[in-house]
Each structure stands twice: as C-alpha cells, then as structure tokens.
Curated annotation (Swiss-Prot):
Organism: Prochlorococcus marinus (strain NATL1A)
The reaction(s) this protein catalyses: a plastoquinone + NADH + (n+1) H(+)(in) = a plastoquinol + NAD(+) + n H(+)(out); a plastoquinone + NADPH + (n+1) H(+)(in) = a plastoquinol + NADP(+) + n H(+)(out)
Details of cofactor binding: Binds 1 [4Fe-4S] cluster.
Record's keyword terms, sorted: 4Fe-4S, Iron, Iron-sulfur, Membrane, Metal-binding, NAD, NADP, Plastoquinone, Quinone, Thylakoid, Translocase, Transport
An example Gene Ontology molecular-function term: 4 iron, 4 sulfur cluster binding
Top-level enzyme category: translocase
Stored PROSITE patterns: COMPLEX1_20K
The keyword 4Fe-4S appears for this protein: yes
Main location (coarse class): membrane
Membrane topology label: Peripheral membrane protein
Binding site for [4Fe-4S] cluster: 65-66, 130, 161
Gene expressing this chain: ndhK
Protein name, per record: NAD(P)H-quinone oxidoreductase subunit K
Length: 249
C-alpha cells in the first residue's frame, strides 16, 4: 500500500467543525416552566432538617404556673398543632424538652434522667424566670435550682413570669430556624456542654431553729429564746395572782 503524497492530513479546524456539526454544541440545558414547578433541587441535609423542624415532639416538664400558659396553646385560639408539635409522655419518643417552672434539688436527678433518655438530636427550651434564674422562689430558698442550665444544656431561653403564649410561639419559630441551619457533618463534632449562664448559688448559713428542745420548754417561744424564761415565769405569777383575786371576789 502506497501513500498518496498529494493527499494532506485534515487540519484541526476541520476536525473541530466536523465534530460540532455531528455532535452539536454542549451548552446549558433549558428548564421548561412545567419542569421547574415539579422538580426541587436540594440536598439530603436540608431535606432531613426540613422534616425534623416540621415535627418537633415536645416532652412537657411543668412544675409551676408557667405550664398553664403552655396549656393555653392546646386550645383552638392558638392551635399549636400547625407547627407540628405533638406532646409526648415518654422521653424516648420526644426530641424537645420544655422545662416550665421551678426546679428543686429533689427533682433535679429526675430531670437529668429524662434528658438522658431522649434520643439525639434533642433540644431544650427553658421557659420562665424560675427555670432560667430560679425566680422569686430562690430568694431565700435552699432547695431551688438557680438555673436549669446547671443541670442540662439549654438551646433557647424564654424569659417571662409567665411568658405569654405568643412568646412561646416565637421561641418555637426560633428553634425551627436553628434546626434548619444545622449540619449533619458538624453535629458529631460539636457537643453541647453545660454553659452556666445563670447566677451562682450563694447560700446563707442559717442556724437550725427547731432543735428538739421545745418539747422540754414551757413554750416554743422559750425554746427559741431561752433568755425569755425569767420574764415568762414572772408574767405567769402575775397572771395567777390576778386570777386568784378575781376568784376570791
């Protein structure tokens, strides 16, 4: 086989023109109006967050008057079902813990146990002044916990005494925004810790008033103040003297 010296090899421009003519130019595909209305482009992470924020199942932990305001949401006037809130009685079926009211030292282990039994991811809303800082019940009380964030991590603080139902809705909306912006890859790296944002416990040592000696004393007042014993005896003698004079007359 002999090569024809007069036949030249095709140029690169001719090859490019032939390729474009046979294959067609590669461009951005056009999306029709019908196609754009039926297809949504998103990520698996956004889809997962969207499903969770629309189905928050709260576990209600009400210990005081703040819980009455949350109970008002169940009625038709506020209708909290539109946010996908389904109250649960078991912590294993809930992903939102709403703490409403004063938390005492005796109830603290039970609250921590309920939080630990909730599956991840889980969220906590501290509702009311008594839950956030201890409130008025912690002024001279040695049993009130001054802030629930000393026991469990809190995602959202809802101040008020008590907060109105509209404020509870605002807290739920803010929590939904937080859930929508979460990342699945970063959730395992970032762990919730105790932040201790509330005031510390400053207890005053008070001596015991009832020490068992009041059973041996004449009155409980003398048991608390032994220095009044002489005055009490003198007053008692005067009363007995007056009563004898009245009886003789």
């Amino acid at each position: 086989m002999e090569l024809n010296p007069l036949k030249k090899s095709p140029s690169s421009e001719a090859v490019r023109n032939l390729r474009e003519a046979s294959c067609g130019p590669v461009g951005t595909p056009t999306v029709t109006n019908d196609l754009s209305e039926n297809i949504i482009l998103t990520s698996l992470e956004d889809l997962h967050n969207w499903a969770r924020l629309s189905s928050l199942w709260p576990l209600l932990y009400g210990t005081a008057c703040c819980f009455i305001e949350f109970a008002a949401l169940i009625g038709s006037r506020f209708d909290f079902d539109r946010f996908g809130l389904v109250p649960r009685s078991s912590p294993r079926q809930a992903d939102l813990l709403i703490v409403a009211g004063t938390v005492t030292m005796k109830m603290a282990p039970a609250l921590v146990r309920l939080y630990e039994q909730m599956p991840d991811p889980k969220y906590v809303i501290a509702m009311g002044a008594c839950t956030i800082t201890g409130g008025m019940f912690s002024a001279d009380s040695t049993t009130a916990v001054r802030g629930v964030d000393k026991l469990i991590p809190v995602d959202l603080y809802l101040p008020g005494c008590p907060p109105r139902p509209e404020a509870i809705f605002d807290a739920v909306i803010k929590l939904r925004k937080k859930v929508a912006n979460e990342s699945i890859s970063e959730r395992s790296k970032i762990t919730q810790t105790h932040r201790y944002l509330t005031i510390p416990h400053k207890m005053k040592r008070v001596e015991a008033k009832v020490n068992g000696q009041y059973l041996k004393a004449k009155t409980q007042l003398i048991a608390l103040n032994p220095s009044l014993s002489e005055e009490f005896d003198q007053s008692l003698k005067e009363v007995q003297k007056i009563s004898e004079e009245l009886s003789s007359n």
